[in-house]
Amino acid sequence: MIYRDQLSTPLGTLTLEATDRGLSSVRFPNRAGPCAGQSPDNSVISQAKQELTDYFAGELKQFSVPLDWQGTDFQQSVWEALTNIPYGETVSYADVARAIGRPKSARPTGGAVGANPLPIIVPCHRVIGSDQTLTGFTGGLNIKVALLELEGRLIE
């Protein structure tokens, strides 16, 4: 079963989806998709909502909600590497590629970062270009900037 609920945040209303195994999707207002709404209570959704609320209040730096991400083995290795980027820090796509043992795979790594179904929770907003420029983000660059600023990372 897919559980679904929404959370009002400083960035707008996020749509959260979970299975019995874990959180499976976080969508920004510009990507709400079909069937946005509420379903029966689910402990994973409740935990994700509380952790996101604490994150936006500046009280949480590392998420612990169980995850149920669906993707290729390569994508999952990239997403796992993203969870190791510390709060308030940024890395390049090349850094992530090196972290998964594929140093010549910066471009495919970028594709996997862009396919991340769990933005914020799996912090793809902390990945920037090798030249320190901001690159695409599923919620839009303005939201990426807001998340980095929330974490104390000033972007010029």
Per-segment meaning from a language model:
Residues 1-104, 150, 154-156:
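Basic nucleic-acid-binding alpha-helical/helix-turn surface characteristic of O6-alkylguanine DNA
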Residues 112:
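Residues in the recognition helix of alpha-helical DNA-binding motifs
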Residues 106-109:
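Helix-turn-helix DNA-binding helix
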Residues 124:
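Short cysteine clusters
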Residues 130-156:
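…primarily DNA-binding HTH/wHTH and HhH modules…
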Residues 115-117:
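Terminal helix-turn-helix DNA-binding modules in bacterial transcription factors
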Residues 121:
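Major-groove DNA-recognition helix of helix-turn-helix-type DNA-binding domains
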